[in-house]
């Protein structure tokens, strides 16, 4: 994505430079090129998974989450967030903020395709995992739009053997099909440890595969 595209479409592409401080911190991440690298990137649900490495101690996990981000921001900063690490696997969580900001699903998917194809063009053997948007108390009113986006993400992932779709939506609902309130901190949007433990049930088999 070019700077001119962003400047000419401010409603479609939120300012990526608002993440400058976080990007500078991510640039300082130390990693071992002699050990397989697994990158988790995306918005605050990734950024706030502070102890993710403790979940998968036998793997080199690199967390490049940046809170409040949208798929277009990930595309803009892809070199720092993903490509520089030459990863074997990339887990991507975006779309949550995109829908909340009113971005149309076709635009979100266009940006998703660009992100995935940019990774695949440089690292054709890299496995790319698209994590579904999660349900939350704060954004439960957007569940229909999230459901439509998740369907599109799943279909897109199914088109390539090196892509996967990680459905965290379903496991975060209770027996009545409503989001489980015990999985969130007070804001009703971000998860507590119980929420991440639920995510682990979906993500672990992919990490270990």
Residue ranges and their predicted role:
Residues 1-40, 50, 54-55:
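N-terminal secretory targeting modules
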Residues 7-14, 61-71, 100, 188:
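Acidic/histidine-rich helix-loop elements
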Residues 46-55, 60, 71-109, 129, ...:
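Oxyanion-hole/transition-state-stabilizing segment in secreted/luminal serine hydrolases
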Residues 105-115, 145-150:
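Charged helix-capping and loop-helix junction motifs
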Residues 123-127:
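A short helix->loop->beta-strand "cap" motif at the edges of active sites that frequently abuts
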Residues 137-209:
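Catalytic His-Asp segment of secreted/periplasmic serine-dependent ester chemistry enzymes
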């Amino acid at each position: 994505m070019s700077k001119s595209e962003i400047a000419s479409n401010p409603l479609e592409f939120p300012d990526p430079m608002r993440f400058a401080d976080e990007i500078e911190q991510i640039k300082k991440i130390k990693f071992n090129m002699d050990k397989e690298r697994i990158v988790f990137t995306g918005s605050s649900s990734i950024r706030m998974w502070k102890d993710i490495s403790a979940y998968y101690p036998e793997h080199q996990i690199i967390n490049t989450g940046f809170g409040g981000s949208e798929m277009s921001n990930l595309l803009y900063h892809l070199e720092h967030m993903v490509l520089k690490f030459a990863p074997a696997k990339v887990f991507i969580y975006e779309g949550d903020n995109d829908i909340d900001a009113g971005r149309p699903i076709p635009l979100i998917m266009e940006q998703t395709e660009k992100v995935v194809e940019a990774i695949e063009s440089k690292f054709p053997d890299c496995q790319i995992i698209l994590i579904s948007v999660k349900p939350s108390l704060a954004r439960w009113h957007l569940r229909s739009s999230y459901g439509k986006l998740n369907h599109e993400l799943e279909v897109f992932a199914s088109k390539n053997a090196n892509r996967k779709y990680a459905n965290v939506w379903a496991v975060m609902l209770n027996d009545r099909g409503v989001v489980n309130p015990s999985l969130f901190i007070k804001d009703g949007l971000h998860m507590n440890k119980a929420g991440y433990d639920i995510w682990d049930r979906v993500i672990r088999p992919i990490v270990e595969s």
